[in-house]
Amino acid sequence: MNELVNRGGPEVVILTGVSGSGKSTALRALEDAGFYCVDNLPILFLEKLLELSGHTAGEVSRIALVVDAREGRFLADAPRVIQEIRQQGADVEVLFLDASDESLVRRYSETRRRHPLAGESGTVPDGIAAERQALAALKAIADEVIDTTTLNVHELKRLVTRRFATSEGARLGVTVVSFGFRFGLPTHADVVLDVRFLPNPYFIPELKPHPGTDPRVARFVLGQPDAKAFLERISDLLGFLLPRYRAEGKSYLTIAIGCTGGKHRSVALAGALAERLEGGGQPVRLWHRDVEKE
């Protein structure tokens, strides 16, 4: 294994989380992003899988592996195996998907599936509780936890796709997301910025139907003196923060910019901020979460 790591092994994502949180959707998104995906491979075979990938002449450079409650008695070995591989220098990231108990119960009710850990009681809440306990050690070592409570399958797929769309560039991956406070805060955001202090195009009849990506709306929003000052100050702040986050070893940063409905002001400002960051050499993933919502 050491020989493989020294040669430069593949990028590995361990996808885990509670049942019903969206792992199947996330795995499909990873496959679309170019990962070789393996569902329900016993974690003890991970080292062998990495070893075999070293004989593919670079054809397998990104691997995604689902590790969850189906591992059974092997699940307890997962944190140890992952830690050992990391210590050998492998590029392994653990992505944990979670959701509120209420949303998980609702999802199981909609699909009428039995929870895999329901046990003799057969109830979904009992299964959820047992699974949370079984996965606690994996969640503790996760590089990122994504709460999918408020995300639909399309939003989750977009999030994962943009999160892993490229493996090159700066060590710190930056995502700028616009959103509407009406639809709740992005649960995965590291920095949240409120731009509701700006004049709202919603109240201008000729601008109301158009999103912040429309040049007319963008000109109106970005032409405001306060919008210009906001961009200058936020750019200065990020110019201070990003090098320090990199030095700390932080891999990902999500900056969320919100307005009332997530259609006009936040969209225009998020696009402008992303453009500034990219102009400074920082690759950025831009996501307008609520722009199509009413």
From Swiss-Prot:
Recorded hits in HAMAP family, A to Z, give: RapZ_like (MF_00636)
Record's function text:
Displays ATPase and GTPase activities.
For this protein, the parts annotated as crossing the membrane are: none
User: By its UniProt entry, which NCBIfam families does this protein fall under?
Assistant: PRK05416.1 (NF003828)
- Give the residues the record marks as binding GTP: D68, A69, R70, E71
Which GO molecular function entries does the Swiss-Prot or TrEMBL record give?
ATP binding; GTP binding
Chain positions recorded as ATP binding sites: G17, V18, S19, G20, S21, G22, K23, S24
Which source organism?
Answer: Anaeromyxobacter sp. (strain Fw109-5)
Q: Which InterPro entries match?
A: P-loop_NTPase, RapZ-like, RapZ-like_N, RapZ_C
Recorded family membership: Belongs to the RapZ-like family.
- Protein name according to UniProt: Nucleotide-binding protein Anae109_0152
Record key words, sorted:
ATP-binding, GTP-binding, Nucleotide-binding
